[in-house]
Amino acid sequence: MKLVKKILKNSCILISAIFFTNVNLVTVSQALEQSKAEELIKKISFEVNNIISSSRDEPVIIGELEFVFKKYADTNIMALTTLGPARRIASATQLEFFKESFQIYFLNKYARRFRELKDGEISILTSRPIRSGVEVKTRVHLIDWAPLEVLWLVSDRSGEVKIFNIIIDGINLLSSERVEIGVMLENRNGDIDLLSASLRDID
């Protein structure tokens, strides 16, 4: 458990899940295929490792990681989930501003930690259909870390197949972020606009 807490503090594993996913389009009536989810996890994992292992300048690498994140993570679903009940009283304009701010917040918080994932490996164990999409169970191997069991939750609710959550040794990414966002909102007396503005300034 100490290891997991340290990883959460360092923020290096959580964001990796955002990139181990896929973007194939599917129809509403077409079930998300487990094999496709698994193959695309391997594909995107390889892509990200190529980025972080390159000799390019740090700003270039961060920019490339941000681009991948925007493509493969369902930030709209993630943002609304982390906002919690407050989303029901927010206007459409407020929600759009929050979703944009949440994406910036996530990029600033996690993308630059990808250097710590260099030479890491992911092993796919199993996958299974779940109510909201597909759950892919993996084991993540990193240098100087004990292996971790990581679950990636993939959905096509947005019209594209994207990652929307990750669970690391029982610790739920969205639940953790929801608590943190909730505290930030409470500290701002429930002011969603102020929360959104603040998210853009967090490194």
Where are the regions that the model predicts?
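Surface-exposed, charged secondary-structure patches
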Residues: N108-L148, S198, I202-D203
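Surface-exposed, polar/charged faces of alpha-helical domains
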Residues: L32, N50, S54-V60, I89-T93, ...
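Short, low-structural-confidence N-terminal segments
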Residues: V26-K36, H141
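C-terminal segment of classical bacterial N-terminal signal peptides
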Residues: I18-V28
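Early exported N-terminus immediately downstream of N-terminal targeting peptides
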Residues: E33-Y110
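Low-complexity, intrinsically disordered terminal/linker segments enriched in charged
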Residues: N165-D203
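Short beta-strand edge/turn micro-motifs at domain boundaries
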Residues: P147-S175
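Bacterial N-terminal signal peptides that target proteins for export
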Residues: L3-I15
